[in-house]
Amino acid sequence: MREANADADPPDEVRIFDTTLRDGEQTPGVALTPEEKLRIARKLDEIGVDTIEAGFAAASEGELKAIRRIAREELDAEVCSMARMVKGDVDAAVEAEADAVHIVVPTSEVHVKKKLRMDREEVLERAREVVEYARDHGLTVEISTEDGTRTELEYLYEVFDACLEAGAERLGYNDTVGVMAPEGMFLAVKKLRERVGEDVILSVHCHDDFGMATANTVAAVRAGARQVHVTVNGIGERAGNAALEEVVVVLEELYGVDTGIRTERLTELSKLVERLTGVRVPPNKAVVGENAFTHESGIHADGILKDESTYEPIPPEKVGHERRFVLGKHVGTSVIRKKLKQMGVDVDDEQLLEILRRLKRLGDRGKRITEADLRAIAEDVLGRPAERDIEVEDFTTVTGKRTIPTASIVVKIDGTRKEAASTGVGPVDATIKALERALKDQGIDFELVEYRAEALTGGTDAITHVDVKLRDPETGDIVHSGSSREDIVVASLEAFIDGINSLMARKRS
């Protein structure tokens, strides 16, 4: 725990209630198949979450079956279904074989009167009945006070008392539209904690409408909350929810709270959810974003090379990430020398400064600088011909509505001409598979770790930037490379070729 946080008095342990498969799936445009839900649930279980809210069983037959499939996996995590104050929702949770039910109890004036068209006494009675019904059916019961942060505490006390009396085991305080500030959250949870006592698990569920979800969740824990609702990557309705990876790392690193999470798996989990939901993780996303441990500035990179703690709060390995140094107009000599050394290129101080000047000129023109650019500049400064193990002479692709995407390619490998062809799910896939086939025949192998394509301009003639991350299966070396073109197939092929040449240059060194 950092000294600045030493006055905090959070609990020693906090339960992690993950709602990626329920609230997270309510992200506009996201619809997970039962198989995709199962894959995420398994990964959540592997990293150590306490509860997986697998969905809302009463929503559809497919949702019920998906929850049942997860429940039958015999995971260590508790499997939970959401429910309204409706006995039929509880029946659906039972049919889905869930361990627990999360009953949502609307409490604010606008929710009770405008949405439910009930009065508060009716809500109390309905909540009490449904909690008792769920308990009678053998379910662990958690209730959440929907829009709790816009509800006066006196009424929340009544709701909590009624639900506890009916058998609820966990009580939730919800910032449903993200209007709470951390100071207010701390005070409210402190009062609720005092009301319900230490034996009851008080939970908190925060939305990110004003960008405060993580801060509010942490404030609630500082005030005594012993369970937090989170989603992977912070996905969810509107602006999303408190992010699992952020909340966990803040609690573990800044407050010394044990979350039970295997943090070294967080980045892996993040990428899985990103891939299956299609919701991109911003590069600057805390903890798991592509740039979370990436350095370009010469001053920062030089500091990192001397002592990693100068510009990193934690080692990237702690969350399963990796440290990267990228080339750009802010780069310094330390990073250039390090990358040239990896390529087996030795330069003196004067040559190093000339390479730096040329790289900065490229950066000033708005170009994304790759290792291939650095290698080409270095070889020019050294006055020797560019070494390219692999060059593309030509390639063609064919695709159509009733045509299987097919590609053929002609490459030169150390001067030897090689032809290959392949099919794929699309022209990019077919082209890269043809390249792989040509290289494997010559004993050259690589693994694709990550592929990203992004339109830089609008229109059908948009410039597309492709980034790839490649690994040498023999040495374990990883390189990043990229290319920008109007043609995504050309951009992809160039990015792969540059990356493979970088791997081979490193291997030679």
Curated annotation (Swiss-Prot):
Reactions this protein catalyses: pyruvate + acetyl-CoA + H2O = (3R)-citramalate + CoA + H(+)
Enzyme class at the top of the EC tree: transferase
Annotated GO MF terms: (R)-citramalate synthase activity; 2-isopropylmalate synthase activity
Pathway: Amino-acid biosynthesis; L-isoleucine biosynthesis; 2-oxobutanoate from pyruvate: step 1/3
Protein keywords: Amino-acid biosynthesis, Branched-chain amino acid biosynthesis, Isoleucine biosynthesis, Transferase
Record SUPFAM superfamilies: 2-isopropylmalate synthase LeuA, allosteric (dimerisation) domain, Aldolase
Pfam families in UniProt: HCS_D2, HMGL-like, LeuA_dimer
EC assignment: 2.3.3.21
Highest taxon of source: Archaea
Domain Pyruvate carboxyltransferase: 14-267
Similarity comment: Belongs to the alpha-IPM synthase/homocitrate synthase family.
Subunit structure and binding partners: Homodimer.
Stated name of the protein: Putative (R)-citramalate synthase CimA
Organism: Methanopyrus kandleri (strain AV19 / DSM 6324 / JCM 9639 / NBRC 100938)
